[in-house]
Amino acid sequence: MVMMKIVINGIHANLRFSAAHMIPEHESCGCIHGHSYIVDVKVEGKRSGKHGFVADFKDVKDIVRRICSEFDHKLLIPLRNPLINFTSTTRTVKFEIAGKKYSIPEEDCCLMDLESSSAEELSRYFAATLFKELSSKYDISSVEVCVNEGIGQGAIYTISR
């Protein structure tokens, strides 16, 4: 059976979100700053089902848009980062990084079960979620996601069987 790929260009398919984050102890990214992220996706697999799709574009975009909406206009906070000391996560997210104390309303935050909010970790999260959800419906062999922090600058993660 021949493998095929479908490709979704995030800038044209409107797969984007705007969010703030920080990379603790990084020289220039250690302060809260934001990006207008764009998410590109490639799905590889065997054509299957009634319509002979690798995966329905709509299904792929729906999953990506759901994740984008969770992140959009939020401060992305990785809960498993050892450099972040959390003192509270009830209604107000309180944490400390390198002596700097933060107190942010919970509704303005996206608490993520990740070690970092870097483009690399975000691309891994998108790819893993897509792979898991699409595998239950389609005969896919790999998912590649590029999370761009802006045009021309992104991180790619590929997950495969």
Swiss-Prot record:
Pathway: Purine metabolism; 7-cyano-7-deazaguanine biosynthesis
Active-site positions on this chain: C29 (proton acceptor), H73 (charge relay system), E149 (charge relay system)
Cofactor(s) required for function per UniProt: Zn(2+)
Pfam families attached to this UniProt entry: PTPS
SUPFAM superfamilies, per database record: Tetrahydrobiopterin biosynthesis enzymes-like
Enzyme class name: lyase
E.C. designation(s): 4.1.2.50
InterPro entries: 6-PTP_synth/QueD, 6-PTP_synth/QueD_sf
Residues binding Zn(2+): H21, H33, H35
CC cofactor note: Binds 1 zinc ion per subunit.
Gene3D superfamilies hit by this protein: 6-pyruvoyl tetrahydropterin synthase/QueD
Annotated keywords: Lyase, Metal-binding, Zinc
Statement: the UniProt record of this protein carries the keyword Zinc: yes
Family to which this protein belongs: Belongs to the PTPS family. QueD subfamily.
Protein function: Catalyzes the conversion of 7,8-dihydroneopterin triphosphate (H2NTP) to 6-carboxy-5,6,7,8-tetrahydropterin (CPH4) and acetaldehyde.
Name of this protein: Putative 6-carboxy-5,6,7,8-tetrahydropterin synthase
Organism: Methanothermobacter thermautotrophicus (strain ATCC 29096 / DSM 1053 / JCM 10044 / NBRC 100330 / Delta H) (Methanobacterium thermoautotrophicum)
